[in-house]
Design a protein with these regions (language model features):
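Core catalytic lobe of class I
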Residues: 2-142
Length: 142
């Protein structure tokens, strides 16, 4: 969602980390070429990351996120596995979208202490949900 992000590549052809705009870089990858994906997309909560503010119209944000998930499905090998984490508010939408494409193997809860979440008038979320999903539920990368 940020066109100003220039891609940076680490590694060689057999193993690669790409730092760049997710959708732009995903579209460059060949179909069924990736064994494992761990995605931690923006949460769209209005946070400022060095001048880049996560604040989009909800419908546009979900459309962008779902397109990224579609691209991840396209590039994942038949035995591949994808993990995706996001906010507790967004995860129900992500879960529904991913069930259309994948088999959900696990719903993981990453629990942490309250040091980063300070809520005075409500109970703050002290966990983040992670989905583990596969294309083939009997033969997959773990």
């Amino acid at each position: 969602m940020n066109a100003r992000c220039e891609p940076v590549y680490f590694g060689d052809e057999s193993k690669k980390i790409i730092l760049g705009d997710a959708l732009t870089e995903l579209k460059k990858l060949p179909s069924e070429s990736v064994d494992l994906i761990f995605a931690d997309p923006p949460y769209n909560i209005g946070k400022d990351f060095d001048g880049m503010v996560e604040s989009w119209d909800e419908e546009a944000f979900l459309a962008w996120l779902f397109e990224c998930i579609d691209e991840c499905h396209r590039i994942l090998k038949p035995h591949g596995t994808m993990y995706i984490m996001n906010s507790t508010e967004n995860m129900p939408y992500i879960d529904l979208k991913c069930r259309q494409l994948f088999t959900i193997k696990s719903r993981i809860v990453w629990s942490y202490d309250s040091s980063g979440v300070q809520a005075k008038n409500y109970f703050g979320s002290m966990y983040e949900p992670i989905l583990m999903m596969v294309k083939d539920q009997k033969n997959y990368t773990f």
